[in-house]
Swiss-Prot record:
The lineage of its organism: Eukaryota, Viridiplantae, Streptophyta, Embryophyta, Tracheophyta. The gene is PME15. Belongs to the pectinesterase family. It comes from the Eukaryota. It comes from Arabidopsis thaliana. Pfam families: Pectinesterase. This is Probable pectinesterase 15.
Length: 407
């Protein structure tokens, strides 16, 4: 470096140091409040700026928390949120004790049973390592995280450790009218090889009716998301897995979601499948519909396998990368299912959407055939969905602005 810029820099530094000496320093009390504010802002800026730094959050600034009485600093904030969310009760969860609870299950346990009004649980950034149950009495519960890359609930059971696939969940919902925003559900069990026994590992199992997930993440490998029964809505979610990673007998609409395969690549053909839908008879009103989604990742994967004889899966206006195998669909080794399944694609695009080599029981749907799958009427959402999207008029940025008053 030439000498002149070095001298200029030194002079500038010296003048700053001199200036600091001549300014009267504030009291230590206001300094600590400035530090706390900066701490909160720094934490918040990582939420909207560099999302991938979320794993640092819970190491910073917790030494400031003892300056606050948590209830005192959030009175105004909770009343504003209560008004905004139309909830009767707001509970907060924070790993460092700056909320009402330090784990999610404890907060869920105090939710009033069979409540007709909503309870909001706000979960601060961090990885909450616990196996969580929302039992059927905890109706009308809303859980709000700080972004799906910042707030996660994680466990690592498998079918082997839990005794069966369904009980390997990290988070299960049995209650009706459950809503989650901006939070992740993870199963951290190792990714199995295709065909490995008892390695299924569920991140989220949903059995409650009328559930909605906005901006949530679901992370696992085999059997990530057990969409078991009931009507469900997934909006702008991130769903990761390898084998049958969206499965079950739910009736669900997936809108604007990212489906990310982590299936292993190999030379012997198929290494994974997105869906395994469980509809068993004509009478069952179940099925999975994907609209405006994006499929990407690794491996050679199927759009779906016919788990149930009447399995129903439709992809509309969805981008499919080259990881989708040319045949697209699989009969689960039973050719009789080919007559009864509904496997459809409608106006999909991308290298994986080429249907020239699709199996005959995978259909390209007309507009009229697709129409019953592509909007919220598929899940009777016009009746119940508006009650879940209680912050539709606010972006997550606005919610974040409110949260900063507390954290």
């Amino acid at each position: 470096m030439p000498i002149k810029p070095v001298l200029t820099t030194l002079i500038a530094l010296l003048s700053i140091i001199l200036a600091l000496y001549t300014i009267q320093l504030p009291s230590s009390r206001s300094l600590s409040s400035i530090a706390t504010t900066i701490g909160a802002l720094a934490k918040y800026s990582t939420f909207f700026g560099h999302k991938h730094h979320h794993h640092h959050h819970h190491h910073h600034h917790h030494h400031h928390y003892h300056h606050h009485e948590p209830i005192k600093c959030c009175e105004k904030w909770t009343s504003r949120l209560r008004h905004q969310y139309k909830t009767s009760l707001v509970l907060t969860v924070d790993l460092h004790g700056c909320g009402n609870f330090s784990n999610v299950q404890s907060a869920i346990d105090v939710v009033p049973d069979l409540s007709s009004s909503k309870t909001l649980i706000i979960v601060n950034s961090g990885s909450y390592r616990e196996k969580v149950t929302v039992n059927e009495n905890k109706t009308n519960l809303v859980i709000q995280g700080r972004g799906y890359q910042n707030t996660s609930i994680e466990w690592n059971d498998t079918a082997k450790s839990a005794g069966n696939t369904a009980d390997s969940f990290s988070f299960v919902v049995f209650a009706a009218n459950f809503t989650a925003y901006n939070i992740s559900f993870k199963n951290n069990a190792p990714e199995p090889d295709p065909g490995e026994a008892d390695a299924q590992a569920v991140a989220l199992r949903i059995e409650g009716d009328q559930a909605a997930f906005y901006g949530c993440g679901f992370y696992g490998a085999q059997d990530t998301l057990l969409d078991d029964k009931g009507r469900h809505f997934f909006k702008e979610c991130f769903i990761q897995g390898s084998i049958d990673f969206i499965f079950g007998n739910g009736r669900s609409l997936y809108q604007d979601c990212t489906i990310n395969s982590i299936a292993k690549g190999n030379t012997s053909g198929v290494t994974g499948s997105i869906t395994a839908q469980g509809r068993q008879s004509e009478d069952e009103q179940s099925g999975f519909s994907f609209v405006n989604c994006k499929i990407d990742g690794s491996g050679e994967i199927l759009l779906g396998r016919a788990w149930g004889a009447y399995a129903t899966v439709v992809f509309s206006n969805t981008y499919m990368s080259g990881i989708i195998t040319p045949e697209g669909w699989n009969n689960w080794g039973d050719s009789t299912k080919e007559k009864t399944v509904t496997f459809g694609e409608h106006k999909c695009y991308g290298p994986g959407a080429d249907y020239k080599e699709r199996v005959l029981f995978g259909k390209q749907l007309t507009d009229s055939e697709a129409s019953s799958f592509i909007d919220v009427s598929f899940i009777d959402g016009d009746e119940w969905l508006r009650h879940t999207n209680i912050v539709s008029e606010h972006t997550s940025k606005d919610i974040g602005d409110d949260l900063i008053g507390f954290y």
